[in-house]
Swiss-Prot record:
Protein name: Histidinol-phosphate aminotransferase 1
EC number(s) reported in the record: 2.6.1.9
One Pfam family recorded for the sequence: Aminotran_1_2
Record-level GO BP terms: L-histidine biosynthetic process
Organism taxonomic ancestry: Bacteria, Bacillati, Cyanobacteriota, Cyanophyceae, Nostocales
Pathway: Amino-acid biosynthesis; L-histidine biosynthesis; L-histidine from 5-phospho-alpha-D-ribose 1-diphosphate: step 7/9
Species the sequence originates in: Nostoc sp. (strain PCC 7120 / SAG 25.82 / UTEX 2576)
Family annotation (HAMAP family): HisC_aminotrans_2
Reactions it catalyzes: L-histidinol phosphate + 2-oxoglutarate = 3-(imidazol-4-yl)-2-oxopropyl phosphate + L-glutamate
Length: 353
C-alpha cells in the first residue's frame, strides 16, 4: 500500500487502551480505572430531558453552561475554564498550541502513556525523565530540561501517588514553559493543586468526569488556567468540540456533589480493604490516592496472573514496558468484585506453589 502518512505518524506506535469487551459481556472489568458505581441520578435524568431542538442546533461553542457550573464548584471565574471532549482533548490542544520545534515536551516516567502519543502526533521532540524510586519527582532535571510543555500527573498513573505541593510550586515558579497538572484522579485524593493556577500564569490544571463522576462514556473534561493562556488554546481547539448532550449531563453531574462524594467515599474505603487483602496474599502494594492500586505479585509472575485472570473473565492491567513488567495495576471495584478477584488470585497462587 502507498504510504500516505507523515513520517512522524508512520514511525509512531498507537496508544493501547485497556481492553474494552462488548457491552453486555459478563466480565469483572478492573483494567481502565472506571468508577464501579453508576452516574448521578441527576445526570441520568438530564439525558431523559434532552429534546429535539437541542440536537437540531449546533452546541454553544465554549460549553458555557458547564463552564459556569465549574466556576461555581471551584470558585474560579468562568473565563478561567476551558471545556474539552474528554480531558485527553485538552492535553492535545495544549500540545498543538504550545509545543515548539526547538524545545521538548517533558514529563517524568512512568506516567500516562498518552502524553507520548499526543506529542508524537505533532512531531514534537520528547524528553522522558525517570522518577526516582516510584514517587520522587526529579524536579531539578525537569526544570533543567527547559521544556515548552511539562506534564505532571497527580495522582500519577500507574503509581497512584500525589506529587508534593512544594514540588509543583517549584516547577510552576521556575519553568519557562507551560506546566500541565493532570488531575484526572484528584477526586480520590486528599489535595489538589488548584491554588497554583491563580498564582502562576503558566499553569493549567486538567480534570475529567470519567473517574469520580462515572461518566467515562460521555467524554467530557475541563481545564482551569489563566485567561491569557486559555485564549491561546481556544485558537486551536475544534469548533463545537463538546456536544450539547454532554454539556447538559455533565452540568447535572457536577452539581450533584453529595452523590459523587458518597461514591468516592465507598471507592476509597474499598481501596484500603483491597490493599490490605493483597498484602496478605504476598503482594507489594504501593500507596495510592487514586481509584487503582499498583501492585507487584509474589514470585514475579505478573504476566501469568494477568493472562490467567483474563481467562476467568477478570480484566486487570499489565504493562509490558521497562520498570512495570513485574507489576499489575488493579482498578478498585465494588467490594463484591474485589472479593471475586482476591479469591481468583488465591487459587492461582496456590496452584503455582
Amino acid at each position: 500500500m502507498t504510504n500516505y502518512f507523515r513520517s512522524n505518524v508512520e514511525a509512531m506506535a498507537s496508544y493501547v487502551p485497556g481492553e474494552q469487551p462488548p457491552q453486555g459481556t459478563q466480565v469483572i472489568k478492573l483494567n481502565s480505572n472506571e468508577n464501579p458505581y453508576p452516574p448521578s441520578p441527576e445526570a441520568l435524568a438530564a439525558i431523559k430531558d434532552i429534546d429535539g431542538e437541542c440536537l437540531r442546533r449546533y452546541p454553544e461553542p465554549f460549553g458555557e453552561e458547564f463552564r459556569k457550573a465549574v466556576s461555581q464548584l471551584l470558585g474560579v471565574p468562568c473565563n478561567w475554564v476551558i471545556v474539552g471532549n474528554g480531558s485527553d482533548e485538552i492535553l492535545s490542544i495544549v500540545i498543538r498550541a504550545c509545543a515548539e520545534p526547538t524545545r521538548k515536551v517533558v514529563y517524568p516516567v512512568p506516567t500516562y502513556v498518552l502524553y507520548r502519543t499526543l506529542t508524537e502526533m505533532q512531531a514534537a521532540d520528547i524528553l522522558e525523565i525517570p522518577y526516582r524510586e516510584y514517587n520522587i519527582l526529579p524536579v531539578a532535571d525537569l526544570i533543567a530540561a527547559h521544556g515548552s510543555v511539562t506534564f505532571i500527573a497527580s495522582p500519577n498513573s500507574p503509581s497512584g501517588h500525589v506529587v508534593p505541593s512544594d514540588d509543583l510550586r517549584k516547577l510552576a515558579s521556575e519553568l519557562s514553559g507551560v506546566l500541565v497538572i493532570d488531575e484526572a484522579y484528584v477526586d480520590f485524593a486528599e489535595e489538589s493543586a488548584l491554588n497554583l493556577v491563580q498564582d502562576h500564569e503558566n499553569v493549567i490544571l486538567i480534570r475529567t468526569l470519567s473517574k469520580g463522576y462515572s461518566l467515562a462514556g460521555l467524554r467530557l473534561g475541563f481545564g482551569v488556567g489563566n485567561p491569557q493562556l486559555l485564549n491561546g488554546l481556544f485558537k486551536v481547539k475544534d469548533s463545537y468540540n463538546v456536544d450539547a448532550i454532554a454539556c447538559k449531563v455533565a452540568t447535572a453531574a457536577i452539581t450533584d456533589q453529595a452523590y459523587k462524594n458518597a461514591c468516592v467515599a465507598k471507592v476509597k474505603a474499598s481501596r484500603t480493604r483491597l490493599a490490605k487483602d493483597l498484602k496478605q496474599l504476598g503482594f507489594c502494594v504501593w500507596d495510592s490516592q487514586a481509584n487503582f492500586l499498583l501492585t507487584q505479585p509474589p514470585q514475579g509472575n505478573a504476566e501469568y496472573l494477568y493472562q490467567q485472570l483474563r481467562e476467568k473473565k477478570i480484566l486487570i492491567r499489565y504493562f509490558k514496558q521497562p520498570g512495570l513488567e513485574d507489576k499489575l495495576r488493579i482498578t478498585v471495584g465494588t467490594d463484591e468484585q474485589n472479593q471475586i478477584l482476591l479469591q481468583a488470585l488465591r487459587d492461582l497462587l496456590e496452584s503455582r506453589d
